[in-house]
Amino acid sequence: IVHSLIYTLHETLKVGDGNVETTIEKELELTKCYLDIQRYRYPDVFQVEVKCEEGLKDCLVPKTMIQPLVENAILHGILPTEASGKIWIIIQKQGGKLCVMVKDEGIGVSKEQLKRFKQGETMAENKTRKHIGVENVRDRIRYLYGEGFGMEIQSTQGKGTTVILTLPVKRAEEKER
């Protein structure tokens, strides 16, 4: 747990280092450390399955992109069910784009929240600033990559939520050129 705390703090503080992107591999390592911390806080509450298509771990993505989605799945999806649940992180190529999915078996999101999110507004119903991490990820993708890339949320109340990020396929070695 100490290693996970130190690694998470170190990586989070590096956000201001001028690099806005990191590899999928590093992003998954940060997310794993975050999950270690949450498993300590909430033992036996959630399971996580990660599936990353072969050859995609060197793709570049915005820093601290997966962790806020996983955090949201735990805190706003799984925990309110008062039962254990599962979270999937799935990374694959679809139609020439990088697709990152975070899916949970949580309580789901209301249609009103989904509508507000699609309109670019806050998902929080009472301006409590819940879901700020999800909104931050959405806004950073729009800023960094423009039209054709972004975030979609699919949800059924009582069944769970799937967040789908669509990103360009950029390799780490391409950035170094």
Predicted regions and their residues:
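Two-component histidine phosphotransfer core
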Residues: 1-154, 162
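Gram-positive cell-envelope targeting signals
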Residues: 92, 173-176
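Short C-terminal beta-strand
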Residues: 161-170
